Amino acid sequence: MMYIVFIMSVLYVVGFIGFSSKPSPVYGGMSLVVSGGLGCGIIMGSGGSFLGLVVFLVYLGGMMVVFGYTIAMATEEYPETWGSNVVVLGAFLVGLLMEVFMIMWLFSGEHELVGFYFGGLEDLMVLGEGGFEYVREDYSGGASLYSYGFWFLAMAGWMLFVSIFIAIEVTRKRY
C-alpha cells in the first residue's frame, strides 16, 4: 500500500507540474482535476476514507463549476498543448526532472523520507489506546474535521462561494 500511495504522490506532483507549465486552460483544468482526484486517493490510501470523500466532494464538486465556466469562455480553435511550444514543453520537462532528482535525493539514504513534524496530534490517536481498539480512523477523522477543522470547512465554503462570483464576473458579457 505504501508504494501505491507513493506512486499516487508522484503523479499528484506531475499533475501540478503540468498545470504550472501554462498550457491551454482546457488542459490546465484537466491536470488540476486529476491532481485533486489523486490527492483524495492519497488521503484514502492513508486510512482517511471519510476525509478523502469530503475533500473529493468539496474540491472537485465546487471547482468543476469554475472549470466549466472558464473552459467555456476560453475555448480556442487550436489549444496549446504541452508539446506544441518549446517553452511550455521545456518548463514541463524541467519540473519533471526536478521531481525525479528530489525523489533520488530522498531515497539516497542520507535523509529521512518524511521530514515533517506532526507534533500536537496526540489527541487524535485513539486506535492505540486500551479501550478504543474498535474505533475506526474514519470516525475520529470525521469528528476532527468538524471540531478541529471547522475553520477549514468554513474557509473552503467561502472560497467556493467567492469563486462562483469571480467566474460569473469573468464570463459576464460587456455591452
UniProtKB/Swiss-Prot annotation:
Class of enzymatic activity (EC top level): translocase
Record-level Gene Ontology MF annotations: NADH dehydrogenase (ubiquinone) activity
Membrane topology type: Multi-pass membrane protein
Pfam families cross-referenced by the UniProt entry: Oxidored_q3
Keywords of the record: Electron transport, Membrane, Mitochondrion, Mitochondrion inner membrane, NAD, Respiratory chain, Translocase, Transmembrane, Transmembrane helix, Transport, Ubiquinone
Main location: mitochondrion
Location in the cell: Mitochondrion inner membrane
GO CC term (a single one): mitochondrial inner membrane
GO biological process: mitochondrial electron transport, NADH to ubiquinone; mitochondrial respiratory chain complex I assembly
Transmembrane portions of the chain: 1-21, 25-45, 51-71, 87-107, 112-132, 148-168
Catalysed reactions, semicolon-separated: a ubiquinone + NADH + 5 H(+)(in) = a ubiquinol + NAD(+) + 4 H(+)(out)
Function: Core subunit of the mitochondrial membrane respiratory chain NADH dehydrogenase (Complex I) which catalyzes electron transfer from NADH through the respiratory chain, using ubiquinone as an electron acceptor. Essential for the catalytic activity and assembly of complex I.
Subunit structure: Core subunit of respiratory chain NADH dehydrogenase (Complex I) which is composed of 45 different subunits.
Protein name as annotated: NADH-ubiquinone oxidoreductase chain 6
Species whose genome carries this gene: Loxodonta africana (African elephant)
Lineage: Eukaryota, Metazoa, Chordata, Craniata, Vertebrata
Gene: MT-ND6
